Curated annotation (Swiss-Prot):
Protein name according to UniProt: Ribosomal protein L11 methyltransferase
Subcellular locations according to the entry: Cytoplasm
GO CC annotations, alphabetized: cytosol
Gene expressing this chain: prmA
SUPFAM superfamilies on file: S-adenosyl-L-methionine-dependent methyltransferases
HAMAP family: Methyltr_PrmA
Annotated function: Methylates ribosomal protein L11.
Length: 293
């Protein structure tokens, strides 16, 4: 069976109302997506967490006349004047198979691979992390995650303790453990991230070496040889006193989730106590690394 798909750009404040309205107009399915691949966690019961700039995607039966749908949307007041939209015909497919086919093993640095569980491992002798998209995003596809994974791959983590601040799926902490770290600690504000990290650690056989804490319950004396934080520039600057205190003397720090235009202000904050290295850039994103002076 074929479908007609309409994709509308919206804000997170209006996305749910638009979704409800489209269902009233006869949509059989409505989903939310972010074109910039920004990480987001699965919502808690009764909660819908969205990106600041959200695309609303609705499917209609192929026989649906879309002009009345567009007219109703214009008259609803839910979208800005001259709102952007795209309508296209979608052929029926095995959507689960299609989704799975889009994820492939990815290499980061010289040793590290991130592999979906349903794919064959390209190099059994490499450091392989098995991770599937699921409870929390963070699978290596976003430039910031890739930058952090490559940085960890380039460090000698043998016998060291690593803190993954804002752990999400736990991908960075798990990768660090597989790369030789003795122990890792994951910290996040979201309980769903803690669950996801624990599940992924279990699947990779490293759960016994990973401690997980909600940020308001982390021990006051936490310290690590390596601290990595892949969040956003604003929180990185605000949390400078917290993050910098987590790093042991002569320890390593890696920060990402930072746009190129924001790098200077983040560097200014952390240069107070860290000897910073040249900024690494990928697409519009960058990574800041340094050693505690």
């Amino acid at each position: 069976m074929a479908w007609i798909q309409i994709r509308l750009n919206s804000t997170n404040e209006r996305a749910e109302a638009i979704s409800d309205f489209l269902e009233e107009l006869g949509s059989v399915s409505v989903t939310f997506m972010d074109s910039q691949d920004t990480p987001i966690f699965e919502p808690l019961p009764g909660e819908t967490r969205l990106w600041g700039n959200t695309d609303v995607i609705a499917l209609f039966d192929a026989e649906t006349e879309m002009q009345p749908v567009l007219t109703a949307l214009r008259q609803s007041g839910l979208l800005e004047e001259g709102f952007a939209y795209k309508i296209e015909q979608i052929e029926d497919k095995d959507w689960e198979r299609e989704w799975m086919d889009n994820f492939h093993p990815m290499q980061f640095g010289k040793r590290l691979w991130i592999c979906p569980s349903w794919r064959e491992i390209p190099d059994p002798n490499a450091v392989n992390v098995m991770l599937d998209p699921g409870l929390a995003f963070g699978t290596g596809t976003h430039p910031t995650t890739a930058l952090c994974l490559e940085w960890l791959d380039g460090l000698d983590l043998t016998g060291k303790t690593v803190i993954d601040f804002g752990c999400g799926s736990g991908i960075l902490a798990i990768a660090a453990l597989k790369l030789g770290a003795k122990n890792a600690i994951g910290i996040d504000i979201d309980p769903q991230a803690i669950l996801a990290s624990g599940s992924n650690a279990q699947a990779n056989g490293v759960a016994d070496r990973l401690q997980l804490f909600l940020s308001d319950r982390q021990p006051a004396d936490l310290k690590a040889d390596v601290v990595v934080a892949n969040i956003l520039a604003g929180p990185l600057k605000e949390l400078y006193p917290v993050i910098s205190q987590l790093v042991k003397p002569k320890g390593d720090l890696g920060l990402s989730g930072i746009l190129k235009t924001q790098a200077a202000s983040v560097c200014e904050a952390y240069a107070q106590t860290f000897e910073l290295e040249p900024v690494a850039v990928r697409e519009e994103w960058c990574r800041i690394t340094g050693k505690l002076a």
